[in-house]
Amino acid sequence: MLLRKQFFRLFSGLIVLLVVVNGIIWISRHHRKSNLDEHFRGEGIAAEFAGWNGDICNRLLDCYTLGSWEFKPGLTKKMIHERREVDKGILENLDFPRELHREDGRCGQINRLFPSGLPSLCDEESEKPCCNEATGLCGNSNADCLCPYCKDFSKYFAAELANWKPSSQKCPFQHFNSDSTCALLNEHVSDLVFIGDSFIGHLFLTLTLLITGDPVRGALRSTLSEEEKEQCSGELQFFAGKHSCHLKLIRDLEELDTNQLCNGKARFKSYFVEAYNVNQFPLAVKTVKNLLGKRKAIIVLGVGIHIHLNATMVIAKYLKPFLSLIENSGNDRPLLIWATIHQVDNFLTSDCVKNYSPIAKFNEEMSKFCRARNIPVFETSTVTRNIKSNDGQHVGYGGNIAKVQILLNYLKSRFEICQSSEH
């Protein structure tokens, strides 16, 4: 009888304790949500997110992708000229002409470059930087620069000469270096995994260069010969080119020497899983399964180009199965971030209309699906607008380091503001 009474008292005490603890957790979360609402209740941020009632912790990412580029302080004509020479070298490595304009001032689809056969653009440095495809001539008047099939090439710039800056002052933006990146990831992340196509692979590549502090050779495999390393050094790491540099990059930080990573003190894992079409989906599923339940695991996912920009198929074959795995695991981790397909348009308007209108539609459909399920959406198109692409698809170090800085700032803010409300 005595044992029964003691058991009853103990059980009653546990019930009371659970009620108190749950009450404290509810109050903490309610108070934290109030703080979040207060943090975002401002003239600027309210206007930016008007009409969307999504979770604040997920829309934090939008706070960093809404912004603009500012040229770096102290930028000189010499630096601009040197950058243009670098770009010409990249074009040459891609088997493109070093100059994409003709000397006779003609441009457009009907005026091709010899011997490459590429359509001619206009010289951005000349007095006539605009191509009017209707006339096939370069010019500088409104009729040449502002018509529906005109393109002003003087407005495009190399991202390496500029810094990305969020529009809202409510988005504190830190420029991460190797040490601060390591500190952030060591404290808050167990696995940072990138799944998708070459656009997503470039995020992993850039993160690797940032962590190693070596933008020249930081992502090249150690087994390469000295000649191969030289052929693919620097920004050539971002382009396949004549030396197939994309095949000479690491896919996992574990491929590097330990001392290259956070002074030998990296406690997190990061790797790229190249799974960009339906046939490679099983590899992506295996990756997600290995991360189920890991509270500090994060996946950045981006596919579409190699699935014919079919949003219905991507949702059915990638996102829904991923979400089902995560939900059925009884946990809400790993954290899934969807990255849209970036867009570049420093080419003829006719090419841009043909190639990028379908991308914009795909991005819109995917973003709508993700936002309805509180999946953070990394809107990369806002970041790549008006920056140069040398191959018409990819951006180099400048565009990708901006993306990685945005991602790190988002994660930092999410960890600081939202972490206790998510546990």
Question: Over which residues does each language-model region extend?
Answer:
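A compositional signature for long Ser/Thr(±Pro)-rich, low-complexity
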Residues: 2-423
